[in-house]
Amino acid sequence: MLTNSKQAVRLNEIAAQHKDRMDFYCIYIQEAHPEDGWQVQHNLDDDIVLNAPTTIEERAEIAEVCVLRLNMEMPMLLDDMTDQADGLYNALPERLYLIDEAGIVRFKTVAGAMGFKPEDWANAITELLGVPA
C-alpha cells in the first residue's frame, strides 16, 4: 500500500493536470509488508497493520482502505490473486509507469520507495504529451 500521503496528493495533482489527454489508474498489487509476512517499522508507526489477503475480496477491501486513507482520486484497479500485473511490471513494492496508447512502456521509475519519484513521472508525461513542464 502506498503510504505517503504527500506523494498521493502529488499523484492526484498530476492526474488532474493531464486527465483530458490521458487516462490514469492505480493498480493495487500484493501487500509488500503484511503483518503475517515481512512487516516493517514505518508501517507500524503509521498504523498500517494488514495481513496478506488470500482472496480477491480481501484485496479489494485493502485497496479501498488505501483509496480512502490517501484520498486517491484516480481509479484503483486490482491485480489478480496470481499477481499477474506485479509479475509483468515488477511493481513490488511500488512503482510508477507511463504506458502509451500502443501499450509501449515510455517511462518507469525504479521499483521501491527510493525510486518512487512522482516528479520524474510528471516530467515524462509532459515530455510525451509535448507540453511545457
Locations of regions flagged by a protein language model:
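Chalcogenol-based redox active-site neighborhoods
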Residues: M1-A133
